[in-house]
Structure formats: structure tokens, C-alpha cells
Amino acid sequence: MARTKSSRGFLGALFGRKKKAPARKKTSLLRKVTYMLIALFTGGGSIAGASEYDWIRTVWNLLRERIHAPTAAPSGTSGVDGDTGAIRVYFTHPENPPEQAGDIAHAVVGYIDATEQTLDVAAFELDNRIITDALVRAVRRGVRVRCVTETNYIDESGIKALRSVGVTVIDDKRDGALMHNKFMVFDHKAVWTGSMNFTENCAYRNNNNGVYIPDAHLAENYATKFAWMFEQHKFGAAPNKTDRIPNPLLTLADGTQVENYFSTHDHPANHIVNTLKLAKKSIHFLAFSFTHEGISTAMLDKHAAGVEVSGVFEKTQTAAGHSAFFKMRDARLPVFLDGNPRNMHHKVIIIDSEILIVGSFNFSDSADKSNDENLLIIYNRGVCAKFEEEFQKVLKIAREANP
């Protein structure tokens, strides 16, 4: 695209040496410019062979550095493990007995009980008793509840309970690929997502995370993906090549910048690799399954460049010998097998204590190319601090189990 006089003026206005706008206007400017770029160019094709949103993402990062660097969200008190501005963070506590470790499940129940009109549930599995009971209560008080699930778990107790009260449940009916999401959309206003399946094991025995984000634009993304699965029975890819998730780049009410991608159409692994390239000081990760060559290579490259790279792997997922654990161990990175007698189920990367990668997305080719998955990249020091605490806790247990 030729650079016209008007386009030079536009770029100059963005990146030229001008007096800084007042702080309260920075987020608004970033949002307006980003949305304008998306509106102008996502209608068709790609630029210089770039994958789906890569070129937009490049502009996003330039704008972020120029206009609005990551800032810590203010601390709050209403989240169980951490209320960091617009994002509430939760973790499981498998070191405690179930009757003392149910905070994350009770949090989900609280959000379900507060739902007034619509509730869309994408559940890889559903057998957690109190979450199921809350969903049934929602149906009985008139909330429209819809559900998509993985075919392999269509007969779980929670799915049967929903069907018994008239909820329509759609399963993916695919062999060799999974509907692996674990998210809920509340009243088209807020989203719950993370690594935790809505099960007894995941809530009480496995290491997991969940985030609650009240944002209508993010909810629109998840509602769009849900509709593709529930209404069009389209799992994995988008229904059509022209279909898009509406808000891949967004800014929350507290200024937190978020990227949001889904498998397979958004190629989340590419976005993970590109984000890893931003690392200057540290990369900390917790990985249930980690076999993706591109992601592991990006981490090893950063290690070679002097960035501290450290992580914990779920031990049962290394048995086949294909895990990135062995390559990293051979390169003498401080990586460990987890110490939970059950499963360490996180899928988390923390970069420079500023950027968090989180969601249902395991670091594997299947997650990127076959499954239905969701991924968030969150630029917020406060949220990263909460996940860093969890990383250090899991790392300590792993070190003690593997002296």
C-alpha cells in the first residue's frame, strides 16, 4: 500500500515527537487507533503473507510501548486469590482437603448465581457437584443456559443434569480433536476462563487457575466463538474464511490491554511465540502438556540470549518422551517435574513479570491445529504478580519432590 501524504501525516501524528496527551486520554487513543486499524484492514487478505492478526498485533505492540506501557492494576479485596482491577484471579489449592480447597469452585458458583438472563457454558467436562447445582438453579429461575461439550464426556453427571432440566447440549462429534474450552459467558457482560475443567478433580485435586473478567467486548468474543459451536455446529475452524472474532485486541476499564485468540483459526501458537520474543528478563511457565516445537525453541533462544527461563512440567505428560522437558533439561535450564500426586494442570507463561499467557491452550500442536481452545495474553503487572506467586508455590513443591 503506497504511503500517501495523508498517511504520512497519520503516522506522524502517532509516532512523532509531540507533547504527550494527558494520562486519562492514553487508553482512549490506543483503543480508537487499534479499532480503526482493525476496521480498515481485517475485511480481507493479509499483508506480506502475515498470518491472521500478526500485522495488527505488531502495530498494537508499537502503540503499547509508545502510548500506554503496562501498568499494575489497583489491588482489591473481593477476589479470593486476587482482585486486580478489572480481572479477578483464582487458583485451586490441592494441598488442602476438598472441604477447605473449594474457593475456586465457589467463585464460579457465585458468578452463576448472579447471572440474570443468559449463560453460555463451554465445558470440556462437567461433573463438579456445586457448579452443576448452580447451573440447574439458574435454569429454574429463568436464565437461558446453553452448553457445548466434548463428545468423549457427553455422559458425565453434570451434562445429564443439565439435559434433565431442558438445557440443550451440543457436543463436537469429532474424532482426534477436542472441544477443550472451559469458559462461561455471563449475560454478555463477563467471562470466566482458565485451565480448570468444571470437575471435582480439577477444582479440588489438580493445580489450576481461573480468571473472571467483566468486559462486554471480551464477552462478545467468547459469545461469538460459542455461537459458532452451538448454533452452527462448527468446531475448530471458523465457519467461513471471512468470519472473525470481533475484538482480538482490547483494553479493559482499568487500562489493562488484552489479546484474545481461539484455535484453530487464530493460530494461537504464533502469538505465543511472538510474545515470547518480547522477553528481556524472565520467562516462567507451568505446563500440563508441552510438546510444541516452535514455543520451546523460542524459549531456548531466549535462554541463549541471557533471559532467565524456568518452568514446571506435569510429570505424567513426559512419559512418552516427546515433551519439551527433555530438550530444556539437556540445555541445563532449571525445569522440574511437578510434585502434585494428581495433576499440575496449568497452561501459563509469565514474561518479565508484565505479560501473562493463560487459557485452556496446552503448548502442543493439537491445541493449535485441531482442538477448540481459547487464549488470553494479558498486559498487567498486578495480575502477573498473582500468577508469579502461584508459579513459585508450584516450583517449590516440584523442587521438594525432585531434590
Set out the residue ranges of the language-model regions:
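Charged, low-complexity intrinsically disordered terminal segments
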Residues: 2-171, 177, 185-403
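Active-site microenvironments of hydrolase-like enzyme catalytic domains
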Residues: 180
